[in-house]
Structure formats: structure tokens, C-alpha cells
Amino acid sequence: KRPFEGSVVVAWPCTRATEACLRACPAACTCSSVEQGCSVRCDRAGLLRIPAEFPCEAASIDLDRNGLRILGERAFGTLPSLRHLSLRHNNLSFITPGAFKGLPLLAELRLAHNSELRYLHARTFAALGRLRLLDLTACSLFSVPERLLAELPALRELAAFDNLFRRVPDALRGLANLTHAHLERGRIEAVASSSLLGLRCLRSLSLQANRVRAVHAGAFGDCGALEHLLLNDNLLAELPAAAFCGLRHLRTLNLGGNALGRVARTWFSDLSELELLYLDRNSITFVEEGAFQNLSGLLALHLNGNQLMVLSWAAFQPGFFLGRLFLFRNPWRCDCHLEWLRDWMEGSGRVAHVPCASPASVAGLDLSHVVFERSLDGLCVDPEELHFTTYSPLPSPEPVATTVSRFSSLLSKLLAPRAPVEEVANTTWGLANTKLSDSLPSCGVGVLGCKVTFVFLFFLLPHLGGHGKET
């Protein structure tokens, strides 16, 4: 009996917790007992205000997709066990300072997709000292009060993309425990040297799809722990020489979809642990020697979608590039300067799809199919730049009238009245394929018409000759 009695004693607290969870469940919600307490689901319930009471044991409350507009002070009462609170896709326009008081253990707060929530008071998140994740996605925020996040010393992750920020919020500075910051798809125009001060634990920063035109020197100076930096799809045309200096733990750097015209050797000098480098969809025409020399651990380099005609092996020396290289959608000139790349493609199998744009003799071929000839002294010979001429087997178009053709036509008209119809036809046809002298009629003695014709032609020829020069 002892094992049976013991099992009843163990199950009794669970039963009591389930009963308490169901007993205090709001009418429009569903509640269930979970390992950490009580889960309350009020999503899509058509609520226009916060329920007056929640189970005291509530560990998670979901109020997504309702019609909530305002959160008053202590909007949720006192819930000592609450760890997860979600208010996404509502119509929140104002949150009273102190609305989240009474939630001492709250670790995740999701306020995403409240498009009317355009302003937050500096004391909005007061008393949330345990908060680790804050989601402010798509809230139409123009700015964040500088002291707003200072009340959140434990904050690890901030999601604030799809907002209207024009600069990196000053509120981020000094968040010593922040590890992830999502600021993509906004209107941020620059990363200033003071934007990221004090973020010594930051491991992931996303600024993609903003309007960033400038990254100031030293902007990432305090971010030595950064592992993933996304700056793709912005308006960057240039970077400072030591743009990423000190980021020795960086593993992913995405600079794709910008307006960069060159790749400098100083940009990546400190990135010895970099694994993924995206430089695709830029306007790059030149890569400096040694630009990738320290990237010996690189798994993939994306240079596709640029304006590269040549890529020197010196860009990778003295390091040794081991990863995959993506080079498609570039106007490659497949001459001897790319012979090393052709050999590498054959030997490693880690480079593919390098279509040639020139010289003409290999245009349209993939570089892997180009055969480089050798001179007598063993040097590489560039493929020929062919000059094609057009040949058509069809009859040529009617030529432009010349002096001879005009003269022949005039002569035919002069002689036509004195010849039978059949002779005129034959004479006109023959003029196109004979010399001028052969085209003149045979003039016998005493033929007055012929003499008059010659006199006329004597005065006419100089005029026709001058006109022919102009044509």
C-alpha cells in the first residue's frame, strides 16, 4: 500500500494546481496547467479590455489579435509567477507608465504589430528587472527614449525592426548584457561612432534593409564579442579603412545589396574567424591585393552580382582560401588573368558558374571550358578577340545611285525613242553589267542624232563627275 499512498501524495499538488488554474480562468480564455504553472490563452477572443482577473499561478498569458487599445496602471494586477506575456497584433496606442508593475518575474514581453503605438514613456518598463526579451516589432516608433531600456538590466534580446528609426536608438547604449539587437527594415541612415557604446556582450546585430549610407570609424569598437553583423541592402558606397577593426570573433558579415565599388585590403584584416562573407549585389569592379588574405577559415565568399571582369589570385594571398566562391552574374573577361581560377575550379570543385563575357572567341562559355594556348616559350596566350563580319546569301539591296549609273540611265532615256521597244529593253538591262564605253551606241557617218548626243555628253560629263564626288 505504501507505493500507492505515495503516488497519491505526489499527484495531489498537481491536481490542486490544475483546479486553481481552471477556477480563475477568464470567461473568454482557455487555461491549462503546464510544467511551470498555468497557461492562459486569450488570443482571437475579441477582447477590448484586459480581463479583470487571471489565475494567480499564471506563467504565460497570450492576448494576441484582440482589440486592446490602452494599458492602464497595473493592468494585470499581481502575478508573481508570470514569465511570458504576449500582446501582439492589437490596437495599442498608449501604455501607462507602471502598466507592468506586479510582474516581478516577467522574462518575455511581446508588443509586436501594434501600429498605433508610436510613443513609449521612459518609465513604461519600470520594475521589469528580470526581462530578457522585448519585442517592439512594427510599432511605428519614430524614436525610443534614452532611458527607456535603462530599467532593463537583464535584457538580452531586443527586436525592434519594421519601425521608423532614423538612427540607432540611443537607448541601446550601455546595455551591458544585450546579446541580440534586431533593427532591420527601418530608416536608419548611419551607424555613428557612439551608437553602440558599451555593448560588450552583443553577439548579433542586424541593420539590414535600412538606409545606411555611412558607417563611422570605430562604430563597432565596443562590440568585440560580435559574431553576426548584417548590413546588407543599404546604401553604402564606401567604408572606412578600419571599419570592422577589433571584431576578432565575427563569423558572418553581410554587405550584400549595397553600392560598394571596390574591396579594400584593410576591411577584413582583423576577421580571422570569419566564415561567411557576402559582397554580392554591389557594383564592385576591383578587389585589392590581399583583401582576403587573413580569411583562412572562410566557408563561403559571395561576389556574385557585381561588375567584376578580373579577380587576381593576389587578393587571397598569402592566406589560403578553402571555402566556396560564388562568382556568377559578373562580366568576366576570360583571359590569362583568370587561368588560376580555371585551374582552381578544376582542382577544388568549390567554384562553379563563371560565364565569360569576353573575349569574343569565348563569350558565352563557362570559364571551366576555356582552353588557354601556350606560346613557344610556355607563356599563356589570351583567347582571340574576334572581329566578325556579316555575310548574307540573299541578294544585296539596291545600291545608291552613282555617276555611272546615273549616266547610263540618262543615256538610255536619250536613246530610247530611236530604238524599237525590244532593243531598248535589252540595252537597259545590259548597262548594269557592262562598262561605260560599251554602253555607247555605234555611230555611223552622217548620223546627226549621234553627233548631237556626243556634244551633249561632252558638256554633261564634267557636271556628273563633280556630283559623283559628293555622293
Label the predicted regions.
Residues 47-52, 72-74, 96-98, 120-123, ...:
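The feature encodes a structural signal of leucine-rich repeats
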Residues 34-75, 79-82, 88:
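LRR N-terminal entry segment and analogous cap-like coil->beta motifs
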Residues 45, 66, 90, 114-115, ...:
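Consensus "Asn ladder" position of solenoid repeat domains
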